[in-house]
């Protein structure tokens, strides 16, 4: 389990772009992670997306899954951004949105390591709310040394 203070050690993102609030499961041997993003009406993106019917932007759901996958990658390598390693989101495959994410929802983020070749990492990711799938994708990240 990781609280927000430890998450901040493994992700370089900060408000308003830090999209993982808590890690509840992390298995480096099984190469999987489960994390939460608590979606509040106070999120800055709700001011414009959409004021009368607020919906979390899909690209931010993808980013939240990528951040959870990034934590898994850092933990698997036993490194942190402060050590000079970063992951850049470079693409996705098999991306699907299934239902909107609304204020008050708890977004459950799951990522499983698929492969790493030439510092290109691939993760199978899923986001859900109340046990219902919201989004799924294969997230592709590039590992870079600073």
From Swiss-Prot:
Signal peptide: none
Main location: cytoplasm
EC numbers: 4.2.1.59
Subcellular location: Cytoplasm
Gene Ontology molecular function: (3R)-hydroxyacyl-[acyl-carrier-protein] dehydratase activity
One GO term (biological process): fatty acid biosynthetic process
Record field: catalytic activity: a (3R)-hydroxyacyl-[ACP] = a (2E)-enoyl-[ACP] + H2O
Entry keyword annotation includes Ligase: no
Domain of life assignment: Bacteria
Class of enzymatic activity (EC top level): lyase
InterPro entries: FabA_FabZ (IPR013114), FabZ (IPR010084), HotDog_dom_sf (IPR029069)
Active site: 49
Family matches, as SUPFAM superfamilies: Thioesterase/thiol ester dehydrase-isomerase
Single GO cellular component term: cytoplasm
NCBIfam families: fabZ (TIGR01750), PRK00006.1 (NF000582)
Family: Belongs to the thioester dehydratase family. FabZ subfamily.
Reported function: Involved in unsaturated fatty acids biosynthesis. Catalyzes the dehydration of short chain beta-hydroxyacyl-ACPs and long chain saturated and unsaturated beta-hydroxyacyl-ACPs.
Protein name: 3-hydroxyacyl-[acyl-carrier-protein] dehydratase FabZ
UniProt organism field: Pseudomonas fluorescens (strain Pf0-1)
């Amino acid at each position: 389990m990781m609280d927000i203070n430890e998450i901040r050690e493994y992700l370089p993102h900060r408000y308003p772009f830090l999209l993982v609030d808590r890690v509840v499961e992390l298995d480096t041997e099984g190469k999987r992670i489960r994390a939460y993003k608590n979606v509040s009406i106070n999120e800055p993106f709700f001011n414009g997306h959409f004021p009368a019917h607020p919906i979390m932007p899909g690209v931010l759901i993808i980013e939240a899954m990528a951040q959870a996958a990034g934590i898994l990658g850092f933990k698997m390598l036993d490194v942190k951004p402060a050590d000079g390693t970063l992951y850049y989101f470079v693409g996705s495959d098999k991306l699907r949105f299934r239902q909107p994410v609304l204020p008050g929802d708890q977004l459950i983020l799951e990522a499983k390591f698929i492969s790493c070749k030439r510092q290109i990492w691939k993760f199978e990711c899923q986001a859900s709310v109340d046990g219902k799938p919201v989004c799924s994708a294969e997230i592709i990240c590039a590992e870079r040394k600073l």
